[in-house]
From Swiss-Prot:
Belongs to the ComB family. Its EC number is 3.1.3.71. Pfam families: 2-ph_phosp. This is Probable 2-phosphosulfolactate phosphatase. Gene3D superfamilies: ComB-like. HAMAP family: ComB. The keyword Magnesium applies. NCBIfam families: PRK00886.1-1 (NF002052), PRK00886.1-4 (NF002055). InterPro entries: ComB-like, ComB-like_sf. SUPFAM superfamilies: ComB-like (SSF142823). Keywords: Hydrolase, Magnesium.
Length: 239
């Protein structure tokens, strides 16, 4: 199994994704939100690029819609929820559709539509994602959403942890140089949150008093669910 990493949403080459399995990672916080919402019984998540598109879907839909997302880590005016996974509890999201728009994560998802399979991962479900990848048994591209188009160490080290979870299942992994680097960084910094504390995005969220979000997002493998993008929606994968 060949594994490569793309360092941000801006670095995605859509042609390269054709017929590939792709993993989207944005641990702070979009993929943590999506994983949490799906685990708590959300019917589906619709990832969109713009606030206007999200509001149009909510306006025209007959479904029970929750609008969620952020711009520059802040809740969008007129939306029900921000991009905090702690808001997407079972009593709010069960059986409902979440329309989500974020600065980085939903852009990475929307830029990956050419892929054969798109799975959503974060630290909170990495082992479950690794099991799904093993079942697919296909070459893999891990896409880091990044921060405003730039490299983000939090997504990168999460990629390294995901690779390590895969190594615990199978040994026939062929890593690109960047994938080897991500795995090396994780193996030498297994206390991920301590390593990431000086990162730009982490510091931004901490400055907004979002320590509880950070604490939640840096937990490993508390959820045994893998969301999958399919036909316009993100649902619970049956892989």
């Amino acid at each position: 199994m060949n594994i490569d990493i793309v360092i941000s949403a801006d670095h995605i080459d859509e042609k390269r994704l054709i017929n590939k399995t792709v993993i989207i990672i944005d641990i702070l916080r979009a993929t943590s939100v999506i994983t949490t919402a799906i685990n708590n019984g959300c019917k589906k998540v619709i990832p969109v690029l713009t606030v206007e598109e999200a509001k149009d879907i909510a306006k025209n839909s007959k479904e029970d819609i929750i609008l969620g997302g952020e711009r520059n880590a802040l809740k969008i005016d007129g939306f029900n929820f921000s991009n905090s996974p702690l808001e997407y509890t079972k009593n709010y999201v069960e059986g409902k559709t979440v329309v989500l728009s974020t600065t980085n994560g939903t852009r990475a998802i929307n830029n990956s539509f050419n892929a054969k399979t798109i799975l959503i991962s974060a630290l909170i479900n990495s082992k479950a994602t690794a099991k799904a990848i093993d079942k697919l048994n296909e070459d893999l591209i891990i896409i880091n959403s990044g921060t405003n188009g730039q490299f983000s160490i939090d997504d990168f080290i999460c990629s390294g942890y995901l690779i390590d979870c895969l190594y615990n299942i199978r040994k026939d992994l062929e890593l690109s140089d960047i994938a080897k680097t991500a795995h090396y960084i994780y193996m030498n910094n297994k206390d991920i949150e301590s390593f990431v504390k000086k990162a730009t995005h982490y510091s931004r969220l901490k400055s907004l008093n979002l320590e509880k979000d950070l604490e939640y997002c840096f937990q490993k493998d508390i959820i045994d669910v893998v969301p999958q993008y399919k036909d316009g929606y993100i649902i619970k994968s049956n892989i």
